[in-house]
Amino acid sequence: MSQVVKVGQIEIRYLVDGAQTGGLGVFEMKLPAGAHVPPPHSHTDNEECVYVLEGVLRYSVDDETRDLKPGDWMSTPRGSVHHFSNAGTETVRALVMLTPDIGVQFFRDCDRGLGVMGEEG
């Protein structure tokens, strides 16, 4: 059964847990129009690949930025700085694959951190 977590403006629906696949995690991400999240970041231990299903996702890896349309994909090697946004007028839906998986609990913890920051700020 899939698990849904909201992290700020991002909705994440976990489809495949890495514990079931020897390390590969897969989730569907929904990003509303106008969303510019997350800030630039990197994963030292994880490879990431995004495949767009609907909408146009602006995806940046290091110094390369592309507007990904349905059927387009882009990969993020370990240690590469990346971020994404939805500058369009419709919700973006994309599949995100991580290896090794960081797990749904990582996103729950991120969501709790955002809630705490919002309450204090």
Predicted regions and their residues:
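Acidic/histidine-enriched, glycine/proline-rich intrinsically disordered or flexible terminal extensions
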Residues: 105-121
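Short acidic-glycine-tyrosine-enriched beta hairpin
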Residues: 63-81
